[in-house]
Each structure stands twice: as structure tokens, then as C-alpha cells.
């Protein structure tokens, strides 16, 4: 069944994914909770407590029960005594003034409270206040709630403070507010321990959005997990987009060199380069007869550790052996000297004219960018300084590039190392047999976005990783998705292709079984042939990894002859 045109997962809620006790976000959340509590208490005024909170306190309920029991005993004794002396009863009734309470429930409660306190002996009164002081010492949120209702409440636990507390409690027993539970949760969260916070936040599986709260604080982002142990935050490779054709490589170098030593690269710059993420792999000896610029040593961008790559260890030269003051032309030499092809490229980049290599490709066209470039910095600190100078808009980060002709706004897209891995749940173990390889992943896509896309499509996603290169730690365009359910894994492998829709990204990605470097054969378990398994049969009849002998053995039968293997590295 085709899984094209999937609707991307819409997020709700704002819980911490990881439950790792992120101090920055936890401190921020506590401030927000305090502000929310103050605003709710200003609107609620007197209806800000709940009987549910006070019913949890056994101490208060026991004291009230004892007081009611003692008051009932004293009332019965007085009735017995009055029945025995009728004359004194008349005098007592005439001497006592009737206490008139209004119809309001608050006034009745206040009157009954006055009667109880008058009947309470002095010794019981002191014990009552001492018990309340012990109770308040373990519940600091009571002070916060009581003072928010009564501005004249004292700072210490004196009798006036306890009386206000009792008055508030009795008032809320009759009139409870639905906002009370939320207020008490906010106040109690500030006093919760780190272990309780971790246990509560581990149950959260959904984030509110995919953009981190602050792009400049990548290490404090609460939606992502740092896979790197070191202090680095960004990749040393930065994407720069929105470049017009009039901007030259020299202009880019002159502007961004203020942040540190760097090189400029783009995919069409090195034809013989095997990996555009690491152009230094293409530094191979070349001949002048068949020249292809395969190394950025031949460009204007200087390599790391050299101020001028064309003037290193250069002896005295005659005017006839110099080429525009750059270096000596010697065929087949590369360690700081120019061969004919390098000299032609240097002239073309510096405005000496258009030259052709092998008479087929124009050097200027070959060395011109396609509207975007990659900045390869020597130090990660340079990327952080660059991000600090950028201004943020809805589309991302931008900076004004001052070239020789005009000032141009270009887009800066740094890669956060924290975006390379994402865990849905720490408590679920990762089964290496349920890991799928995702090919053709767009480089701007983060692991959290890829995880929620597959969670919405197939479900039961445990972990997602974006493959990065070893040198710059920049995405390679592929990823891995680990499932916890076998059926979800089988469905993903069976679909083979799926269209990924997210914002401006619309691309078809490939889903294949993931081959580990030491993948064992599931048929013989490596016991007989001692070989790794380079084949995987996606047919539901097999659906397992095979070494080469086991593949031929199991698929020699005519019923399995039509099975097509998925080969490692192909």
C-alpha cells in the first residue's frame, strides 16, 4: 500500500521530552508557573483554595474533630448542669447576650469560630498553634497562598496568621473554585524534587513544535538529545543560500574570514570529489594533460595552516617563469607550486580572463557557484560567532553580506549537533533487528521531524538518527529509524518508498533494512561460514539477513527463485 502524501504530525502540548532535568528549561518553566499563579490569583481573589488540598492534611482534620468533640462534651456538661440548677439557668440566659449571625455563610462560620475559640482552654490553644506551626514548616506553599489572599499576613507563624489560614480553609469548604487544583499544581511543582520531575516528564512523547526555543542555545534545547560528549554545539560546515551570480568566491572569503579560517565549497566545484562534504579527500596528483580541478588547494580559498598556498617554499624565480605573480609553472607538482591547470584556474578566479581546460569546459562556469555554498570553518567557535551576528526571521537565520558591488541578504543554515539524534522514550530498548535505513533524507530535516513523521505514518518509533560525516559532522542525506513493533517495521520495509512532506520539503525517501558493519547471517548465525550477511530478502516468506552461501542455498528452490535481494552498499 502506498504511503504517499502523508500529513505531517501536528503537535500539541509543551512537555519536556527527555525528562533529563534540563536546568535551563526547568528554571524557565518555574518562572512561567509563578507568573501564571499570580495572574490566576488576582482574578480569583478569595476563591483561590480548594478543600481537596486541605483534606490531604490529616493533622488539620484530626484537630478539628478533637475540637468538635470537646465542644460537644462541654455543651452536654453545661446542659446537665443547667438541668440540675434551673434558677441559675435563668440567670445564665438573662446574662448572656444572644450572638446574632447574618444569613451569610461566611459570617456564620466566623461566629462559630469565635465560639469555639472562646470555649477552648488556654493549654489547648497553645497546643493547637504549635501543631499548626509544625504543619506549616513542611508546607511552604501555604504561606504563599495565604499571603496572596491577605496582604496583612505576618511573615512568621503567629496566631494572626493561623487564624487567617483557618478562616480561608473554612471558607473554601463551602465554596470551592475549579481553578484551585491548577494553582496548587503550579505551587507544588516548584517544590518537587528532580527525581519526581524526571519520572513525570518521561511519560511525555509529544512536543509543541519543531523549532528549538533559541537557535543560539542549541545545547539547552529541550526537544533534542546531545549525541556528542564534547563541548561542540554546531557543525563546522555551514550552508549559505540566496547568493546571486554576481557574488564571487573572493567576496565570500573576505566577508566570512572575520569569524576565522575557512574554505568555500559547493558540489560542482570538484568534479572528481567523491564526497562533497569532505573535499579534502580529492587531493590527488593530477597531470597537466588531463586536468580536472579536484582539490580546493587550486582555488583562491587557502588551506588550513597556510597564509598563501602558492608562495610556500618558493625559491627565487625569474620573470619568465612567473605566471601573474602567483607561482612557478611546473607540470605534475602540487605541494605549493602551480601546474598549468592550477595557474589557469587562478587566473580565471582573479579576473585574468576565461580559459578552458581540455578545450571543452569553461573554467569560469565550472568554478561558479549555483546560488549556494558551504563554509568549511577550521574551528567550531567560528560558527557560534557567525550565528550570534545573524538576525532571525520566520524563514531562519540571515546575515547581510557586504560584497564589492552591493550588500546582499543571505541565509545562514547552521547544523546543530543535537539535531542528529532523537529518542522517543528512554525506557524502551532498541532492537537492532528492527532498524530501517532511510535514504534520500533532505539535509535540512532534523531527527525530531523525521521521527514524528514515521511515528504518524507507522507508529512505534523508538529512536531516529541522521547519518553525519566524520570530519565536519554534517548530514550525509540518510538516516536510521528504530522501531519497537515488528509489524510496523515490516510495513515500512514493504512500502519501500514514501513521500515526505514537511513545510517546503516534498521528497520521496527510500526505506531499506539497515546493515550493520558486523551484521550476522540469521540463517546460520555465522557458525558455519563465518561470514557477515551482505544480503537481505524483503519477501515476507524470508525477511531476514543472509550470507552469500546461505542466500544461494535458501533461494535455489523454484518457489524462492524470484526473490530479489537488498544488497549492502547498493
From Swiss-Prot:
GO terms for molecular function: mRNA 3'-UTR binding; mRNA regulatory element binding translation repressor activity; ribosome binding; translation factor activity, RNA binding. The keyword ATP-binding does not apply. Expressed specifically in the spermatogenic germ line. SUPFAM superfamilies: RNA-binding domain, RBD. It comes from the Eukaryota. Keywords: RNA-binding. GO terms for biological process: negative regulation of cytoplasmic translation. Residues 434-516 form the RRM domain. Pfam families: CEBP_ZZ, RRM_7. InterPro entries: CEBP_ZZ, CEBP_ZZ_sf, CPEB, Nucleotide-bd_a/b_plait_sf, RBD_domain_sf, RRM_dom. GO terms for cellular component: cytoplasm; nucleus. Cytoplasmic polyadenylation element binding protein that binds to and regulates the translation of specific mRNAs. Not required for oogenesis. PANTHER family: CYTOPLASMIC POLYADENYLATION ELEMENT BINDING PROTEIN CPEB (PTHR12566), TRANSLATIONAL REGULATOR ORB2 (PTHR12566:SF12). This is Cytoplasmic polyadenylation element-binding protein 2. The gene is cpb-2.
Amino acid at each position: 500500500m502506498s504511503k504517499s502524501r502523508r500529513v505531517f504530525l501536528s503537535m500539541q502540548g509543551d512537555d519536556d521530552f527527555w525528562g533529563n532535568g534540563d536546568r535551563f528549561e526547568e528554571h524557565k518553566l518555574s518562572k512561567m508557573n509563578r507568573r501564571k499563579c499570580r495572574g490566576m490569583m488576582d482574578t480569583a481573589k478569595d476563591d483561590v483554595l480548594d478543600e481537596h488540598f486541605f483534606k490531604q492534611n490529616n493533622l488539620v482534620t484530626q484537630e478539628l474533630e478533637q475540637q468538635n468533640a470537646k465542644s460537644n462534651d462541654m455543651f452536654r456538661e453545661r446542659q446537665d448542669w443547667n438541668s440540675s440548677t434551673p434558677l441559675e439557668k435563668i440567670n445564665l440566659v438573662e446574662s448572656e447576650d444572644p450572638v446574632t449571625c447574618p444569613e451569610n455563610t461566611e459570617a456564620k462560620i466566623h461566629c462559630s469560630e469565635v465560639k469555639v475559640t472562646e470555649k477552648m482552654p488556654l493549654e489547648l490553644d497553645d497546643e493547637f498553634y504549635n501543631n499548626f506551626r509544625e504543619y506549616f514548616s513542611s508546607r511552604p506553599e501555604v504561606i504563599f497562598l495565604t499571603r496572596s489572599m491577605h496582604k496583612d499576613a505576618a511573615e512568621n507563624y503567629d496566631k494572626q496568621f493561623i487564624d487567617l489560614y483557618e478562616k480561608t480553609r473554612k471558607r473554601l469548604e463551602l465554596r470551592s473554585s475549579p481553578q484551585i487544583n491548577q494553582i496548587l499544581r503550579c505551587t507544588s511543582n516548584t517544590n518537587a524534587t528532580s527525581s519526581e520531575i524526571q519520572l513525570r516528564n518521561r511519560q511525555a512523547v509529544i512536543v509543541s513544535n519543531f523549532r528549538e526555543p533559541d537557535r543560539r542555545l542549541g545545547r539547552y534545547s529541550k526537544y533534542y538529545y546531545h549525541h556528542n560528549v564534547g563541548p561542540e554545539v554546531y557543525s563546522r560546515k555551514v550552508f549559505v543560500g540566496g547568493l546571486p551570480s554576481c557574488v564571487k568566491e573572493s567576496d565570500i572569503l573576505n566577508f566570512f574570514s572575520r569569524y576565522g579560517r575557512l574554505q568555500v565549497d559547493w558540489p560542482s566545484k570538484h568534479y572528481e570529489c567523491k564526497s562533497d562534504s569532505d573535499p579534502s579527500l580529492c587531493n590527488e596528483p593530477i597531470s597537466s594533460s588531463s586536468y580536472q580541478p579536484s582539490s580546493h588547494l587550486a582555488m583562491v580559498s587557502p588551506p588550513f595552516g597556510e597564509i598563501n598556498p602558492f608562495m610556500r617554499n618558493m625559491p627565487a624565480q625569474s620573470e619568465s617563469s612567473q605566471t601573474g605573480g602567483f607561482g612557478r609553472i611546473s607540470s605534475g607538482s602540487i605541494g605549493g607550486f602551480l601546474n598549468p591547470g592550477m595557474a589557469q584556474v587562478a587566473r580565471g578566479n582573479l579576473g585574468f580572463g576565461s580559459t578552458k581546460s581540455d578545450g571543452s569546459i569553461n573554467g569560469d562556469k565550472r568554478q561558479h557557484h549555483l546560488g549556494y555554498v558551504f563554509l568549511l570553518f577550521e574551528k567550531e567557535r567560528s560558527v557560534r560567532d557567525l550565528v550570534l551576528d545573524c538576525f532571525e526571521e520566520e524563514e531562519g537565520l540571515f546575515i547581510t553580506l557586504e560584497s564589492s558591488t552591493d550588500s546582499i541578504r543571505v541565509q545562514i543554515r547552521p547544523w546543530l549537533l543535537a539535531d542528529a539524534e532523537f529518542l522517543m522514550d528512554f525506557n524502551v530498548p532498541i532492537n537492532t533487528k528492527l532498524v530501517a535505513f532511510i535514504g534520500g533524507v533532505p539535509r535540512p530535516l532534523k531527527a525530531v521531524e523525521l521521527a514524528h513523521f514515521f511515528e504518524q505514518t507507522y507508529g512505534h518509533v523508538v529512536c531516529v538518527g541522521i547519518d553525519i560525516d566524520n570530519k565536519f559532522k554534517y548530514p550525509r542525506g540518510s538516516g536510521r529509524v528504530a522501531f519497537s513493533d515488528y509489524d510496523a517495521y515490516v510495513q515500512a520495509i514493504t512500502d519501500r518508498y514514501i513521500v515526505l512532506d514537511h513545510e517546503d520539503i516534498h521528497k520521496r525517501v527510500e526505506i531499506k533494512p539497515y546493515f550493520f558493519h558486523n551484521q550476522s547471517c540469521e540463517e546460520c548465525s555465522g557458525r558455519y561460514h563465518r561470514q557477515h550477511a551482505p544480503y537481505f530478502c524483503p519477501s515476507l516468506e524470508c525477511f531476514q539477513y543472509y550470507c552469500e552461501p546461505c542466500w544461494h542455498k535458501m533461494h535455489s528452490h523454484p518457489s524462492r527463485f524470484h526473490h530479489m535481494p537488498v544488497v549492502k552498499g547498493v
